[in-house]
From Swiss-Prot:
NCBIfam families recorded: nfo, PRK01060.1-1
The gene coding this protein: nfo
CDD domains in the cross-refs: AP2Ec (cd00019)
GO BP terms, alphabetized: base-excision repair
UniProt entry tagged with the keyword Nuclease: yes
Residues that bind Zn(2+) 3: 183, 228, 230
GO MF entries: deoxyribonuclease IV (phage-T4-induced) activity; DNA binding; DNA-(apurinic or apyrimidinic site) endonuclease activity; phosphoric diester hydrolase activity; zinc ion binding
Cofactor note: Binds 3 Zn(2+) ions.
Name this protein carries in UniProt: Probable endonuclease 4
Annotated positions binding Zn(2+) 1: 69, 111, 146
Function: Endonuclease IV plays a role in DNA repair. It cleaves phosphodiester bonds at apurinic or apyrimidinic (AP) sites, generating a 3'-hydroxyl group and a 5'-terminal sugar phosphate.
Disulphide-bonded residues: none
Amino acid sequence: MVKIGSHVSMSGKKMLLAASEEAVSYGATTFMIYTGAPQNTRRKPIEELNIEAGRKHMEQNGIEEIIVHAPYIINVGNTTKPETFQLGVDFLRMEIERTSALGVAKQIVLHPGAHVGAGADAGIQQIIKGLNEVLTPDQTVNIALETMAGKGTECGRSFEEIAKIIDGVKYNEKLSVCFDTCHTHDAGYDIVNDFDGVLNEFDKIVGIDRLQVLHINDSKNVRGAGKDRHENIGFGHIGYKALHHIVHHPQLTHVPKILETPYVGEDKKDKKPPYKLEIEMLKNGTFDEGLLEKIKAQ
């Protein structure tokens, strides 16, 4: 069975239960959450995450493993503002604690960081420093470094940069990788015509065993654009065929696949989630040209 799901919302009083219910309504077999808003530091205490009820619902619906995404505000690549770096370190420690408390997530996806003008090498060294401050030998969750598109001053735009970070970290057995299809395509890798070649390259440079999460997104931009703008499955420059191949790749069957595709609709206040129909389409093997209209009609 393919492990596939999407980003879902953990909110209200139900929290983890709400996230699981939303995922199940999409026909998902895994899902990804933020433990609070991705753009700020406000967090409900662990006791209010409704973990027990959420886990029970997951168990009843055959969901064994979920993914946590660290908030965007963490930037341990920042060399110019010590307070930004320190916030990132402290907050990442807290996210590890919160993710461990969930008991059903083994991976926290992290955007490695941005060097904010100091240069990639300086940024990478700072990320290594931050991860060395955060990681402990007895933690039960991994930090999954996300492959980035190369927008602005992002670090992690190539497999070599990801490998350099991993190699510099003391407890690097606690590091894994989240392979984002849109980001990797936008960074210049030909996942459309030669995904197997790209995967082999990843294996040589980073090691395929570290690939523990997949973000499945189409891209609004051509390969190598360095933009990072997600598109709905089959409606971008990667296309349905390539994404279906990746989702069902025999070397990646155990890896959770998470959709982060955009909501659909002209009215900003009434956009519809695409995940139920996109998951269905990726499972059944046939591209549906009328998908966006069907999503709007939900």
